[in-house]
Amino acid sequence: PYRRQRQMCIRDRWSANLYLSMSYFFAAKGYEGFASWMKAQAHEESDHADVLAQYVMKRGGQAKVGAVDAVPQEWASPLDVFEHVYKHECHVSELIDKLVDVASAEKDKASQDFLWGFVREQVEEEATVQGILDKIKLGGDVALYHLDIQLGARK
């Protein structure tokens, strides 16, 4: 009964790997702030997978660790990375919305309540990344320098 939540755990692990790959990409290009921000994103995604697994177990299900597909390793530019991130976050939002729809159809109010926390978080994630994209597009290389410093301050 918790197959979809387990699949979301695997998806969050994939997301963690994606952000870690992006962190390494930025570090190799000298963008320490972007690298740090992406590493924090990776930790956040890993935490999401753990939270989902804990929820499945609290509800009597068995959490499982599944295989995670390889993630991209290269991007053309910082703009390309953040465009990828934005598309990815929108996709994650769609997946979470589907989980909420299933929980609603099954009249599983506990799962609906649990998942709404993720829905709210995704609104923030998409807005944050859209803001970064806007700044990169508006300011070019100067914006990259300042954003690198700004995003590096995230703990």
Predicted regions and their residues:
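Conserved alpha-helical segments that form or flank metal/cofactor-binding pockets of metalloenzymes
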Residues: 27-67, 129-132
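Residue-level signal for short amphipathic helical patches enriched in basic/charged
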Residues: 26-29, 106, 139
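Structured surface interface patches that mediate subunit assembly and partner/cofactor docking
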Residues: 131-155
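Generic structural concept
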Residues: 35, 39-42, 46, 86, ...
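Single conserved hydrophobic/aromatic residue that forms the stacking wall/gate
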Residues: 1-6, 10
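Acidic/histidine-rich alpha-helical segments that form the ligand environment
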Residues: 11, 15, 19-22, 54-55, ...
